[in-house]
Swiss-Prot record:
Its main location: membrane. It comes from the Bacteria. SMART domains: AAA, NIL. One of its GO terms (molecular function) is ABC-type D-methionine transporter activity. The complex is composed of two ATP-binding proteins (MetN), two transmembrane proteins (MetI) and a solute-binding protein (MetQ). It is found in: Cell membrane. CDD domains: ABC_MetN_methionine_transporter (cd03258). This is Methionine import ATP-binding protein MetN 2. GO terms for cellular component: plasma membrane. Belongs to the ABC transporter superfamily. Methionine importer (TC 3.A.1.24) family. ATP binds at G38, F39, S40, G41, A42, G43, K44, S45. Its EC number is 7.4.2.11. It comes from Bacillus cereus (strain ZK / E33L).
């Protein structure tokens, strides 16, 4: 659907070249929700602007549906942009227009007949749950309602792609969840490809199928959501994941390790999370199991569990218990320098 091939964007600033995006190669499949996460200045917003040619790449090519877009004429670009909807952190609504008028705006630009505009806008108002707000102005709406208007407006011309630029960053947690659920509905019912950028890993966790991590203009890690969360390879990705799955060792656990305690990290996936492996080894081997920390989250409808346990008993029995655990779950001994 969307392909970035060795794409770079360089700006000149104060006589120096600044690489906002550097040699990025990515592929976004049709109908998926693809997240790009990074800290401020990572280059993710620049990458988004390259998709609809608000910025042109310094090097490399970008293709949509196998059509290279960097050499399109002005007329062709105008047609391309009708296929791409966009929502923003700051909503970007016209304060002088009603909710109906905001949603209708791109349809009027496209010279759609009035009766069709009315039908389409009413359909979208119902879709985003704002049927009773058609004649309201943006100042009369909450942040979540404003973003719903933004989503409806982005969908007005029936695009194939929806770009979300920090779409939930200005919202409270409850409203964020509501907007993410609405975006899932958009993806599911309209089969839209959604390209989303954020600095919040919990947003990626809730909605994305795949994710790329950017740092200093480069993609440093990319893959399926479950793989990136459960096996983060880079330090930056690990820090993002820890904002959702806190695997830092508490001081009390570190003290136990330093005093000779045998601490192990157990990770469970899918059906493994429902297996009573700890009670089994406690009953069948002469060991005591002390659970020090644990959590379970859901990633794309698959459970992922993380436990820290201390095993106490004779070394021979502990080794037998460990042998059994290795057959059931992923197991790693935690060392004193771990954090």
């Amino acid at each position: 659907m969307i392909s970035f091939n060795n794409v770079s964007k360089v700006y000149e600033s104060g006589g120096q070249s600044v690489h906002a995006v550097e040699d990025v190669t990515l592929s976004v499949e049709k109908g998926e929700i693809f997240g790009i996460i990074g800290f401020s200045g990572a280059g993710k917003s620049t990458l988004l602007r390259l998709v609809n040619m608000l910025e042109r790449p310094t090097a490399g090519t970008i293709s949509i549906d196998d059509k290279e877009i960097t050499s399109l004429s002005t007329k062709e670009l105008r047609k391309l942009r009708q296929r791409i909807g966009m929502i923003f952190q700051s909503f970007n609504l016209f304060n002088s227009r009603t909710v109906f008028g905001n949603i209708a705006y791109p349809l009027r630009l496209a010279k759609v007949p009035k009766n069709e505009i009315k039908e389409r806008v009413n359909e979208l108002l119902k879709f985003v749950g704002l049927e009773d707000k058609a004649n309201n102005y943006p100042e009369q709406l909450s942040g979540g309602q404003k973003q719903r208007v933004g989503i409806a407006r982005a969908l007005a011309t029936s695009p194939d792609i929806l770009i979300c630029d920090e779409a939930t960053s200005a919202l409270d947690p409850e409203t964020t969840t509501e907007i993410l659920n609405l975006l899932k509905k958009v993806n599911r019912e309209y089969n839209l490809t959604i390209l989303l950028i954020t600095h919040e890993m919990h947003v990626v966790k809730e909605i994305c199928h795949r994710v790329a991590v950017m740092e200093k203009g480069k993609v440093i890690e990319e893959g399926k959501l479950f793989d990136v969360f459960t096996q983060p390879k880079t330090k930056t990705t690990q820090n993002f994941v820890r904002s959702v799955i806190n695997d830092h060792l508490p001081e009390s656990v570190l003290a136990k390790i330093q005093n000779g305690g045998q601490i192990y990290r157990l990770t469970f996936t899918g059906e493994e999370t429902g297996q009573p492996v700890l009670s089994y080894i406690a009953k069948n081997y002469n060991v005591d199991v002390n659970v020090l920390y644990g959590n379970i989250i859901e990633l794309q409808n698959v459970l992922f569990g993380n436990l820290l346990v201390e095993l106490q008993g004779e070394q021979r029995e502990i080794q037998k218990a460990l042998q059994h655990l290795r057959l059931q779950v992923q197991l790693k001994e935690v060392e004193a320098h771990a954090s």
